[in-house]
Amino acid sequence: INDRESIADTFRKAFIIATTGRPGPVIIDIPKDLTDPNVKIDFDYKKNIKIRSYKIKTNEDENKIEEAAKILCSAKKPMIYSGGGVILSKASKELIKLTKLLNYPITNTLMGLGAYPSSDNQFLGMLGMHGTYEANMAMHDCDVLLAVGARFDDRVTGDTKQFCPKAKIIHIDIDPSSISKIIEVDHSLIGLSLIHISEPTRRPII
């Protein structure tokens, strides 16, 4: 912040950035002289604020969606792996809808617990070093893995060279920097609603 007139708008922008897309911290640097109690500050701000260079990216390329659907429908040993991003984006209903449509087994990370009902017979329990044997073995042996809102934490992956060694991996995430950051994936969809990928899976894939 370089002047007191921009304080209110800067804080508004910071809250927008912190709470949209992938939520996270925002640093605001306030010079000491602006904290002087004798300095009068107007905290009115514009209702509509445009943030230069900040835009949540989405990828709604129909060809990429169709390709992901083909990979999913060709699976012999599929697995769905959901993380905290599903909770943060309030996409649990979409996740349940897609999982039921595909009739595939599903596991959650610790941060993703609650995104899918634990009482359902398709749920294999939590994944990772503190997870269930069934979930970990199903992940290791799967031939297609759909990762949704997950960051491939080391408590889940363990040795990255041995993680899902036979699987084609599809990663859906709102943050482009998370794609292939830890685990190299075969197919990615950025910021895509699960509704988009569920529609092609309803149709016969030849």
Q: Which residues make up each language-model segment?
A:
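Glycine-rich beta-alpha junction loops
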Residues: 30-36, 84-86, 176
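Anionic-ligand anchoring segments at beta-strand to alpha-helix junctions in alpha/beta enzyme folds, i.e.
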Residues: 60, 73-142
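Structural signature of the thiamine diphosphate
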Residues: 1-45, 68-71, 136-170
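Gly-rich Lys/Arg/Thr-decorated short loops/hinges at beta-loop-alpha junctions or inter-strand turns
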Residues: 41-53, 115-119
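Short acidic-hydrophobic, aromatic-tinged amphipathic segments that line or gate anion-handling sites
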Residues: 1-3, 126-128, 187-192
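Short internal beta-strands
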Residues: 29, 104-110, 170-173
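Single conserved hydrophobic/aromatic residue that forms the stacking wall/gate
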Residues: 195-199, 203-206
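Short gly/pro/ser/thr-enriched loop/turn and capping motifs at secondary-structure boundaries
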Residues: 35, 112-117, 153-154, 176-181, ...
